[in-house]
Amino acid sequence: MVKTQRVVITPGEPAGIGPDLVVQLAQREWPVELVVCADTTLLTDRAAMLGLPLTLRPYSPNSPAQPQTTGTLTLLPVALRESVTAGQLAIENGHYVVETLARACDGCLNGEFAALITGPVHKGVINDAGIPFTGHTEFFEERSQAKKVVMMLATEELRVALATTHLPLRDIADAITPALLHEVIAILHHDLRTKFGIAEPRILVCGLNPHAGEGGHMGTEEIDTIIPVLDELRAQGMKLNGPLPADTLFQPKYLDNADAVLAMYHDQGLPVLKYQGFGRGVNITLGLPFIRTSVDHGTALELAGRGEADVGSFITALNLAIKMIVNTQ
């Protein structure tokens, strides 16, 4: 890296394992400054519960960023709405969680931070607090006024992007339009080049239907929509292979010659990735005007404050964000 960068971290649901994981992140050195957007007492109390050392340094945006030293974090304070008991949700803290996301997002947009790494949130408690919330991806898309974003999950061996995200199965076929596919593939291709440093991305594209439609006998979306779009984009120079049946695509003879897979819907691509690398996966939002990565697991309320949470996914998310920062410099 040319100079030390700042990355901002949101721990997520305060009653879950997010604060535990952030405290665990602090137990090693990092080449970037870790700015945690969270409540002061929440972090110090959780560190005490875990028996881990933690010194919180005030965020000073006008000072040069410094690499993070062991046992320290830089704190950008946001106050809890209610006091927290590990493992017990408090509805009012749904507002607190959204405040941390908004502050972190705005900091990325105004250039304070080079990347954003998010911990797990509890969507139910945020909605119970009266805040419509589908997920991080949609929240950052709206707040950043991005034209379109794409969800991609990745392990060291596999990257899977989604054409659609949190839609009921009955709505997916109607959502797969030529315009959507053009946009999603363009974003995926662009970010693989600019954020992952892949000069000529090779993308495998799943069909929508079983056997990729079996020549139109099991659905016509491949013939009517997917194939024409892929043909157009191939003519522009993109390296696209598909549409391929999803039940046979995820094997070495295809994956060894690909940089990413585009699945048509959430449960088509992600079960394979999570089986292959659960606990090591990272959620990446493509198409944003900043770098955003996230853990690939939930809040695990039952583990909060017990010292049993696995920090592996958070470490992977942070390391990937650092690599993406380097690629974009």
Curated annotation (Swiss-Prot):
SUPFAM superfamilies hit by this protein: Isocitrate/Isopropylmalate dehydrogenase-like
Q: Which cofactor does it need?
A: Zn(2+); Mg(2+); Co(2+)
What the entry lists under Pfam families is as follows: PdxA
Q: Which InterPro entries match?
A: PdxA, PdxA_fam
Q: What does this protein do?
A: Catalyzes the NAD(P)-dependent oxidation of 4-(phosphooxy)-L-threonine (HTP) into 2-amino-3-oxo-4-(phosphooxy)butyric acid which spontaneously decarboxylates to form 3-amino-2-oxopropyl phosphate (AHAP).
Q: Which UniProt keywords apply?
A: Cobalt, Cytoplasm, Magnesium, Metal-binding, NAD, NADP, Oxidoreductase, Pyridoxine biosynthesis, Zinc
Annotated membrane-spanning segments are none
The record's subcellular locations are:
Cytoplasm
UniProt-listed Enzyme Commission number(s): 1.1.1.262
What more the UniProt record tells us is: The active site is located at the dimer interface.
Annotated residues for binding of substrate = H136, T137, K274, N283, R292
Q: Which residues bind a divalent metal cation?
A: H166, H211, H266
Q: How is the co-factor bound, per the entry?
A: Binds 1 divalent metal cation per subunit. Can use ions such as Zn(2+), Mg(2+) or Co(2+).
GO CC, alphabetical? cytoplasm
Q: Would you identify the family this protein belongs to, as annotated?
A: Belongs to the PdxA family.
Task: Please describe the quaternary structure of this protein.
Answer: Homodimer.
The Swiss-Prot or TrEMBL record annotates one GO molecular function as:
zinc ion binding
- Catalytic EC class: oxidoreductase
Q: Which reaction is catalysed here?
A: 4-(phosphooxy)-L-threonine + NAD(+) = 3-amino-2-oxopropyl phosphate + CO2 + NADH
Q: Which domain of life does the protein's organism represent?
A: Bacteria
User: Which pathway?
Assistant: Cofactor biosynthesis; pyridoxine 5'-phosphate biosynthesis; pyridoxine 5'-phosphate from D-erythrose 4-phosphate: step 4/5
Which one GO biological process term can you cite for this protein?
A: pyridoxine biosynthetic process
Q: What is this protein called?
A: 4-hydroxythreonine-4-phosphate dehydrogenase
